[in-house]
Amino acid sequence: MRRTKIICTIGPASDNEEMLNKLIDAGMNVARFNFSHGTHEEAKEKFDRLKAVCHVRRAPVAFLQDTKGPEIRLRDFEGGKVQLTRGQKFTLTTEDILGNACRASITYKDLPKDVSAGGAILIDDGLIELHVDSVDGTEIECTVVNGGPVSNHKGVNVPGAELSMPFISEQDRSDIEFGCDLGYDYIAASFTRSAEDVLAIREILNAKGSDAKIIAKIENMQGINNLEGILDAADGIMVARGDLGVEVPLEEVPVLQKKMIRMAARKGKICVTATQMLDSMMKNPRPTRAESTDVANAIYDGTTAIMLSGETASGAYPEESVRTMARIAERTENDINYARRMSAVEEMDRSDITSAISHATCMVAEDVHAKAIITVTMSGFTARRLSAQRPVCGIIACTPDRAKGRQMNLLFGVHPVIIPEAGTEEELFRAAIEAAKKFDDVRPGDTVVLTAGVPLGVAGNTNMVRVIEVE
């Protein structure tokens, strides 16, 4: 059973019933829906299409909504694009004008207040670099350092600047509320800068009665500097290497990636590693050697999940990308000593009862050479605590709640199974063991460890461990 989870972005290349089925067969655990593009009507069509496929397949694929986030973009140009030349003067303005080769309008009205002479402004993922010469009212006077073509609506980054723009735009608020109504399992919050940003989204979710979990996307130095607080407030983080690689020097990205994965593991939180993992498979049926090594290294570091973006959204080989990623993950995991890794989980707080029992369960499973840990959970809390320990064997998490089952599909090493409601706890436990037999790793005569909270249904009430020989 593969432990590392695979997230696939749904787009034109994958948004049809045939390909969605192929992605599930190939190993997709989570489907990502990018709200930077498209309308609510289009998003609902995609959501409903995958939901129908998953219903027929009884596949507990988790649904992840990725917000647009607080971003700065250029407005329109005369003719749609211009050519900038190294050394020329170029002005950014907050006035709503039609841009040309000398002057362009930006969407963020307070940018002149947030930048100063000597700073840098990057356009189009850093392909265009401007040096800020001076700021005068609504005008930011610049010199082009790296030139090239610039077209409508390209993104603007300001490395090192602490932008004062609000974290949740009206568009994001509308998107999140819409996502709550549809029933997304996770919200990926773009450009998260602080714990307060996470809490602002949590407030919207609570008001809508949503139990969606929050994955904070770390994409700038503000997020890096506030990483510990963000992890405490969020359910996990995403190492969003695209914008992060624009905001910080490229040589810092691998160092920061390892730091983020390590800190998330220490706090028992989800960590997703994303961006250009198999980028060459947008056009080619095989990845580069560097890409396969990149995927493996993220798994060696301890990432919870690895994500495909354009590869499955608009690439020529979406199914092959997932299969390739799954093969790399399985081979890498076979090389990892999880017993040593479990004992090396550093500084994790196990003072609450569920964490202590979960740790004990994992130790027992190692001692008796269990084929699997089986948990019966109503809230998913026990599964999260078990996953955080990185046990030697897989975790089969049984629940009658389909939404909780989907959420657990983003937990490291957790394999969710939907079981029917039962009249008693013992009936649920028996149903869970029967469900575990459907996995190739669990056969009659094998030893498994069962853990749950009695009575069932109380989050954080894990208090029971049993060692069972499968009949």
Question: What are these model-predicted stretches?
Answer:
Residues 1-471:
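Non-catalytic helical/linker scaffolds that mediate oligomerization, partner binding
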